[in-house]
């Protein structure tokens, strides 16, 4: 009987940990800011992390063929059981995007999948399903959670001020 109970506990812990994968936003390690300056653009971004919340501030400009800022994290998922990304966000009443980059061959090399979402100045919860992502370029890998290379939150494609906060990022 004791062996049966131990097996059941191990089964529950394993099952729950596989289905509750979290990107652990409380630990800022591995998250990084990226701007179009890597390709000659002039957008600027500062990122702060406090009490489990990331704060993105800056500006996106299309000057000099630029136009993006991103908060990005490389991840390594071993199973294909996740259906999307959930998070809480607020900001300056602008549109931001979730970007997902896949492993493997891409044309052009910076191709990604994305979904836009609008923020208000109040915290809102967002759930973005992988099936709702739109392709921005060609990727040889199919959209499966075990093919994800990184996940980013981006200000993209137009001139605007970035004032954005995000927390509780997780895969579901």
Language-model-detected regions and their locations in the chain:
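Beta-rich carbohydrate-recognition modules and glycan-binding surfaces
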Residues: 18-172
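Sec-dependent signal peptide recognition
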Residues: 1-13
């Amino acid at each position: 009987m004791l062996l049966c109970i131990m097996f059941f506990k191990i089964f529950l812990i394993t099952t729950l940990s596989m289905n509750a994968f979290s990107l652990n936003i409380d630990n800022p390690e591995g998250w990084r800011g990226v701007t179009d300056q890597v390709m000659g653009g002039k957008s600027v971004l500062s990122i702060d992390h406090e009490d489990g919340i990331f704060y993105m501030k800056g500006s996106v400009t299309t000057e000099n063929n630029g136009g993006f800022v991103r908060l990005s994290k490389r991840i390594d998922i071993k199973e294909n059981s996740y259906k999307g990304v959930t998070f809480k966000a607020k900001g300056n009443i602008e549109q931001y995007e979730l970007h997902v980059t896949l492993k493997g061959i891409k044309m052009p090399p910076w191709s990604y999948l994305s979904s836009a979402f609008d923020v208000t100045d109040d915290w809102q919860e967002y759930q973005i399903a992988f099936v709702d992502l739109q392709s921005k370029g060609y990727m040889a890998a199919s959209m499966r959670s075990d093919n994800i290379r990184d996940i980013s939150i981006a200000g993209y494609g137009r001139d605007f001020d970035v004032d954005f906060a995000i927390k509780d990022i997780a895969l579901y």
